[in-house]
Amino acid sequence: MNKVVLLCRPGFEKECAAEITDKAGKREIFGFARVKENAGYVIYECYQPEDGEKLISELPFSSLIFARQWFVVGELLQHLPPEDRITPVVGMLQGVVEKGGELRVEVADTNESKELMKFCRKFTVPLRAALRDAGVLTNYETPKRPVVHVFFIAPGCCYTGYSFAHNNSPFYMGIPRLKFPSDAPSRSTLKLEEALHVFIPEDEWDERLANGMYAVDLGACPGGWTYQLVKRNMWVYSVDNGPMAQSLMDTGQVTWLREDGFRYRPNRNNISWMVCDMVEKPAKVTALMAQWLVNGWCRETIFNLKLPMKKRYEEVSHNLAYLQAQLDEHGVNAQIQARQLYHDREEVTVHVRRLWAAVGGRRDER
């Protein structure tokens, strides 16, 4: 199988294609990307027959910025007979996947696919039963086995394949299903909540998002991101010239500092988190983030970079390379991840975690 499907935000297919071509090429997995504007997915076709599986095995999914999900597939299945769509799908997967741990019947995230999504939901149950009977799926779901993907691009027309559970998105279609909290000051709160789900393993939340931590929110008004920190019982310094939502101030956990986020300097040395969603040029935001990390003003940060209209992958890559160079120059050991989240628009979200010298018993090496 030599094709890899990458799901992405509609309108960002070129960025997704540029990224996978670049990163696959650096691993000497050569091929070309098939791109259809606003399709919500890209197909990277490798020149060598087995390179599709090699790519999704060797390239860390967490290193991709513009892909929400990926999986290796075979040839396109077309003209599935309405009276029996299951048999051809099972036939394509037999001998390709043995004892997969989960089935996902998916579509691209476009308006055109909404009707198709209804069909996928109905189709999943009988298909799962047939795949279990054929030995393609285990009799129960398990995260230790490959995920089987059936990806419909039109009625009666789909790709079939698989991804590895340790190197994919754990979410259906790569999208965490989050509900907007009615008491949150703005919808931007969902960006930070999604970032926490994407960047921090669930079993580390109690340690890395602990009660009583100190956090800073730069450019906080009206408090969408501060809300997520308060919800996790942190003490938050919210920095913005604009006012904060009264509901947040009433918690007693928020200190509003009426200052410019670019000029603010923290006056305590035990800040665990700094978050930032300021509308500013990416280079200016990246330079500020580098300053915080190099000076050790926070342990972890999540921030957004607003994207230009053109050369968006190049712009993000340039800023992340600058950040890495600054950290390297000052001897700071850190882990950097970036992703265009479902709740992001013309932007990407970046997570950086400073790693200190190893201390016995601490998983984060602080």
Curated annotation (Swiss-Prot):
S-adenosyl-L-methionine binds at residues 188, 221-224, 240, 260, 277. GO terms for molecular function: S-adenosylmethionine-dependent methyltransferase activity. It is found in: Cytoplasm. Its main location: cytoplasm. The active site is at residue 306. InterPro entries: RlmM_FDX, RlmM_THUMP-like, RNA_MeTrfase_FtsJ_dom, rRNA_MeTrfase_M, SAM-dependent_MTases_sf. This is Ribosomal RNA large subunit methyltransferase M. It comes from Salmonella heidelberg (strain SL476).
